[in-house]
Amino acid sequence: WIMGHMVNKIEQINEFLDLGANSIEVDITFDNLGYAEYTYHGFPCDCKRWCTNQENVKEYLNALSDITTPGNPKFRKEQTLVVFDLKTGGIDANRMYEGGKDFAGKILFDYWKGSENAGRAYIIISVPSIDHYKFMKGFRERFDGSAFKDLLLEKVGWDFSGNDDLDATRTAYQNAGIEALNHIWQSDGITNCIPRGLGRVNKAVSNRDSSDAFINKVYVWTVEKYSSVKDALSADVDGIMTNHPNVINGVLKEDEFKDRFKLATYEDNPWTTFKR
């Protein structure tokens, strides 16, 4: 999966798809009560990127639904997966659970349109700290008893993006009521302004490939330097988040990688584990 990074303006969705992305990451900000407000990253962000692009969350989700609904004139089959990078740090601790429930409602009614026939992209709910596991718990439990619980079970996956200890991350999922290997992506990364080694990535890949795994897939962010892309692919990651999807596509076509990797399509299930 080639994940376009920080795609916070509606018009940027097609821009990143045209560059070769098959998935996008969008930042979501919240007020202190846990209500999602804007697609916004803010300062600091990546080098050579504009940090202040934003949209109203409802308007963005509606536009994203159009782009991922077959039969809609705006439909783009390339858009298979969405990573919602949820800026939960400003939510009051006692409102984290309610924030998760509210955002689930926005996905249900603004993205899925209260229907099983709209917004087909798979979704990763990405939370920046294992201490915010109650957001995931609230999101999940919003669908308890719902006619749309099958959509949750089919379409939604999970990620803690704060580079936390992996054993502690496993415990956080248990606290959130999410079982091991239940659509879990593990991210690792840092801004493109600073180099980062692959030590934790290698540990995550080892967990993914082990008999005691809790991780289904591993992705790195934010990567676009040619040598860093090659290093990430050599580490057998499943996804790369990037500002330059065309660079990733170019490396994938090289002899070293063209028979080891393929660009994911909608028919490729993002919850299925592929081991080395």
Curated annotation (Swiss-Prot):
Its EC number is 4.6.1.-. Keywords: Cytolysis, Dermonecrotic toxin, Disulfide bond, Hemolysis, Lipid degradation, Lipid metabolism, Lyase, Magnesium, Metal-binding, Secreted, Toxin. One of its GO terms (biological process) is lipid catabolic process. Mg(2+) binds at E25, D27, D85. GO terms for molecular function: lyase activity; metal ion binding; phosphoric diester hydrolase activity; toxin activity. It comes from Loxosceles laeta (South American recluse spider). It comes from the Eukaryota. Disulfide bonds join C45-C51, C47-C193. The active site is at H5, H41. The lineage of its organism: Eukaryota, Metazoa, Ecdysozoa, Arthropoda, Chelicerata. It is found in: Secreted. Belongs to the arthropod phospholipase D family. Class II subfamily. Dermonecrotic toxins cleave the phosphodiester linkage between the phosphate and headgroup of certain phospholipids (sphingolipid and lysolipid substrates), forming an alcohol (often choline) and a cyclic phosphate. This toxin acts on sphingomyelin (SM). It may also act on ceramide phosphoethanolamine (CPE), lysophosphatidylcholine (LPC) and lysophosphatidylethanolamine (LPE), but not on lysophosphatidylserine (LPS), and lysophosphatidylglycerol (LPG). It acts by transphosphatidylation, releasing exclusively cyclic phosphate products as second products. Binds 1 Mg(2+) ion per subunit. This is Dermonecrotic toxin LlSicTox-alphaIV1ii. Expressed by the venom gland. Its cofactor is Mg(2+). It catalyses: an N-(acyl)-sphingosylphosphocholine = an N-(acyl)-sphingosyl-1,3-cyclic phosphate + choline; an N-(acyl)-sphingosylphosphoethanolamine = an N-(acyl)-sphingosyl-1,3-cyclic phosphate + ethanolamine; a 1-acyl-sn-glycero-3-phosphocholine = a 1-acyl-sn-glycero-2,3-cyclic phosphate + choline; a 1-acyl-sn-glycero-3-phosphoethanolamine = a 1-acyl-sn-glycero-2,3-cyclic phosphate + ethanolamine. InterPro entries: PLC-like_Pdiesterase_TIM-brl.
